[in-house]
């Protein structure tokens, strides 16, 4: 994905602020170069569950299930400093996976930047997922994952989250809005209870009934599994939709 002028401006502003807050940090010039295509695969080893963190500063993230390993990913980028950093450790029977965009604060980009991640996670391992997004577009298809928890922090751009899976266990999902638009698709066959707190933006609820300070779907209180969603609005728009 080519980063739009608007998102590019936000990215440069964020980088400038990060540099200003760093300790005596001077800016460095980052040029746009040739496209680099890289693949990563992570073996779960003996982990019985995993905490996975994805931290992307700018670009396009497509996250799905279907990996035979713990994670299988393809990365394309043309700013050398943005090379993704992947780490994985196992403590006891729990794995800790971190995928983070490289690069330091206080940098100035020149040229047309490109950064695309295609990440696939394992469907069988219970996964506590943390996604931190900056500027760009993200498509998170999480319906096949064995989610144990979700924390999503959005930046500037457009994000779609698919939580329509037939989940085997209840879990909490926390969604923090940013600047832009987010659509969260929710299941009809699994109980959903959503609490939304405002910001400067707008929160829309489709297919959900207002009960007190919460929104619930028709399956709430009837199914063995409940998806508890906490939404903190930002400057943009968040759409909750039962499908």
Where are the regions a protein language model picked out?
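N-terminal beta-strand/beta-hairpin edge segment
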Residues: 58-59, 67-80, 117
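Post-signal-peptide N-terminal segment of Sec-exported extracytoplasmic proteins
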Residues: 34, 43-65
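Bacterial signal peptide processing site
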Residues: 22-24
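Extended beta-solenoid/beta-helix repeat architectures
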Residues: 122-126, 132-135, 142-149, 153-156, ...
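Short, surface-exposed interaction patches in beta-rich subdomains
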Residues: 36-45, 73-110, 158-243
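C-terminal motif of bacterial Sec signal peptides marking the signal peptidase cleavage site
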Residues: 17-20
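Bacterial N-terminal signal peptides that target proteins for export
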Residues: 1-8
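Extended Gly/Ser/Thr-rich low-complexity repeat segments
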Residues: 106-122
